[in-house]
Amino acid sequence: VKHVPEGLVLGWEYLYDDNKEADDLIAELCYSLPNDEEIIIMSKDGDLIQMMALPNVSLHDFTSMLSDEIIFGKYGITPKQYLDYKSLSGDKADNIPGIRGIGPKTAEKYLSEYQTIDNFPPELLDEEGIELTKLWKRISTIPFHQS
């Protein structure tokens, strides 16, 4: 925010809200634009991977444009599976512990086989595990996320 006046002189527009995180504001902007508008988000925030599930949204990490293939190569999942992956394996940066005994490789394996947490057979997660994944997913979901 301290650079906003300089940006205004250059003609930049900005959006700021004391009650929202940057990724929430970015999501609001993405959903407010017409679906035929190409949107490129420049951020290293992994939470924004979920926005790549929208057909008109691309993510650039300041090094390169990310694609479904790059996300798959890094995580073994698609952008649409990112929330389930994070809910299972956890994310220290966001204080999401995930499910005990499930790390990135196991989450990748399960999602490869069952696609979503909703398709997991009952023996894969106990009742507590199911409730926890729903909680972590709800906490991790950027507002306005549409499945």
Where are these regions (language model features)?
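Extended two-metal-dependent nuclease catalytic cores across DNA- and RNA-processing enzymes
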Residues: V1-S147
